[in-house]
Every structure is written in C-alpha cells, then in structure tokens.
Amino acid sequence: FTVTWTRSADGIIRELSLAAPAGATDAARAGVEITANAISDATVAFPTEEIGVGARWTVTRQVDDAVAPTRVTTYELVDLDGDVATVRSRTEAPDPQDTLTAPAPDGGPGVTLDVESYDVSGSGELTVDLRAAMPVGGTTESSTRTAYVDPDSGRRSTYEEDSELSFRTVD
C-alpha cells in the first residue's frame, strides 16, 4: 500500500490518496483507508501567526459525516523546543442534524432515521517535529456514541466506537 498526502505549511492535510496492490482484499483496503484518515485527522493545524507556549487556537473543519459534518478542535501549545512542539487538543462535533438520510444499498428508496443522540469527542497530546510528515510521538483518543430511531417502526439502533492512535519514533 502507498499512502500519499499533501500537507500545507499550517499542518493541514489538503490531499490524501491511497494506492493498493492489485491483490489487496477489500478488508485490507478499508483498514488502510481508516488508518490513513485517522492519521490525517490527528495532524495539528497551526495558526498562521507566530505563537508561543501557552497559546490556544481553534480550528473548524468539514468532514464526511452526514449527521455532524463539522469538527471543532481547540489546540494548546504546551512546549516548544526548536522545531519540536508538544500540542494538546480537544475535538467535538457541534450541532448534529435531527435526522440521518442514507441511500439504500440496492439503489431503492433511501432510509431516514431520527437522531436520538449523537456525541463525538476526542482529545490528545502530540509531539510534532515541524520538519516531519506526521507527529513523532503522543496519543489521540476519539469516541463516537450515537442512537437512531426508525420513525416508522420505533426500532432503536446504537453505534459506539472508540479509537486510540499512538505515534512514536522508531530508531
């Protein structure tokens, strides 16, 4: 597998592409895609103005999420040693939609569900070498908890996902 991304000077990944070997299974492709997107989400977006230790800034970005397409991340610079920065982050998904509309897999009529609850949160502390392609140390954690209700049947569905992404330098 080859994962390629273009990161702008502020740290935001602007383009992400994946290339899989010809014999790769769909499951392997999906796993690499999930990991690549997680790494992309874990990058630190720095402000364009100069900052110092103790600085806090907030970044709002759009994501591929039909219920809560906006993510708001607040960062804090906790240490800076030359080109190496340690940054804490906290992420949330404000203002989720009241309904989720999804196409049917067979191309038939779509499905609309009421969103009973939708909570997305994340936090972490990363060590970022400003000369490196990705963080060189640290961990981020994220959690998603959702509950949907079919308005026709009253059937309730829940979804829970927890993930942790750790970075470390290997010598």
Language-model features: locations:
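Acidic, serine/threonine-rich low-complexity disordered tracts
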Residues: 59-171
